[in-house]
Each structure stands twice: as C-alpha cells, then as structure tokens.
Amino acid sequence: MNVAKVIATCFTKRTLRLKSSLVGDPLGYFGHSQVLRSPEDVVDLIKYNISLEKKINPGISKRDLIIVNNDVGYKNGNNFLREISGLKIPYGKIITCNRKNIGMSFGAYDYAFRKFKDRYDYFLFTEDDTLIAKKNYFKIGIDIFNSYKKAGFLAYIHSTKVDKMYYKPLNLNRKNAISAHGATGLSSTEILKKVFKKYGKLPHYKGNDYQKCITYGEVGFPSSFIKIGYKIIDLPKGLVLTIPAYDLMTKKKYKKWPSNIEIFYYYFKRTIYKIFSISSLTLSFYLKILSCAKNMIAPNN
C-alpha cells in the first residue's frame, strides 16, 4: 500500500494568532494558533515539518510527503523546495511542486491529487501550520476510515456543522451541511476519484477571493463527499493527531476540547454581543465597557 501526505504551503506572512480560539459546531479549539511573521518563517516551518516526518513512524511502510507551494515568487522558499525535492526520508521521499497561487490550500490539494492520483491508495491533506505528527498517524487513520460503512472523509481536526450562509452557494441543507475544519483529513483514492469525476476537480475556488476560497474549498471539498453518498467521520473524541504548529514548536500543551465553564462563557459572551449589536450606539457602548474592564484587570504599565 502506497500513501501520500499532502502539505499545502505558501511563502507569505499569516494572520497572527498567539493562541487557538473556540470555533465550530461542536465547539472546540479549532481556530488554530499561528505565528508566521515573514516568508522566511514559513521556510523554517517547512523544515520543522520535515524534521518531524523523519522522526515519526506513520505506521505505513510506504509514505511519501508531497509539499505543494502556492507560488508567490519568494525565491528563497522556491529554491529551498527545489533543493529538497526527491530527498529520501524514512518510509518514503519528499516531492515538491509549485503552482499558481489560486484557491488557497484547497487548490493545492486538488493539484496534488490530479498529478499523483494513480500512485497512491490514500491521501492525507493538511496545511503547513497544522501538524499531523503522532506515532502511527497514517495507520490509525486508515484503520478508523475502513471501520465505518460509507466513510468518505476522516476529519483529522474535527467535523463541523456549517452556517446557513453556505447553503445556497453550495446547494446544502440542514441534513448535509457538514464540513471539516481546514479540510484536513484522509480519504481513499477510490472515493476521491468519484469526487473528481463528479466535479472535475477536488472542489476549490479558482481565484483568490478569501471568502469564496473558504466557501468552495474548506466547506465545499469535505461536503462534496456527503453529496455523493458518503459520510464525514471523526477521530475518537480523546484522540488528538493534529496539533497547531506554533503550539508544538513552543512546547505549549494543546487543548482540543473546552470545559463546560468555557462553553458557557463563550455562548454567554456571544449572546450579550447579539443583544448590544442591535444598533451601532449600543454596540459602541458595550465595546467601551469591555475596553474599560480589560484595562482594570490588566492595566498598561
């Protein structure tokens, strides 16, 4: 059995998030932390990804690492990828590809599958800043995937119900409006080919509009499995295979699920915000109160 782990990357600075945030339904710490202040930080991140792959046994004897770069013309990064392409690592080799920077990570997933679909039996998709780095991470996923009838996509972060704003553009409804955070997860080549046949691609947006990339990629790709009669399934609740890169690199313990108190506080804040946001005046008043409260708790020195 041959398998491929696809890592989507892009040599640009990213939105700064020092800690993961609560998002999704069910609620979890799935809005992952990330600290990538420059393109060179991304080069270092790719090196870190590779260092982990060299250390960790994926549980499958033939696993290649495919790194797909959404090219923004960063020469140092492009040269680095060129240098490591073909490099042998334990259990396989590194393959690097450059493509036009369209469709974000989800366009990169399509590119990798389109190019290599006849070489591998399973594909595992992730982004460079969410690390799938636990012993036997590939074997565990394949075993879980094959233990479910009609499994189409195994979410390596978690599945989530999606907002009604996505219903119309993706032709969704209450029964099938489910996706997976980051479109991070595993599927078989057999099923991916069925998705590809129906849509002519692994779903993504052929452009750079951020919200459309999320709609037609992060939401559209995982939900496409449901549309062809399969299911999105999850890892057991206590099993964590994917960790934000920033947490792992700084040795910060990653917490996937919130406590009951954290859940209550999250929904309490959201309810209060909705109440005060009925007008710009009340919202401004509420935000001023919050600012004053924060200054009282943690005054600037």
What are these regions (language model features)?
Residues R17-S20, N76-L81, G107-Y109, K134-K139, ...:
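A short acidic (Asp/Glu
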Residues V68-G73, D129-T130, I157-V162, G238-L241:
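Short beta-alpha junction loops
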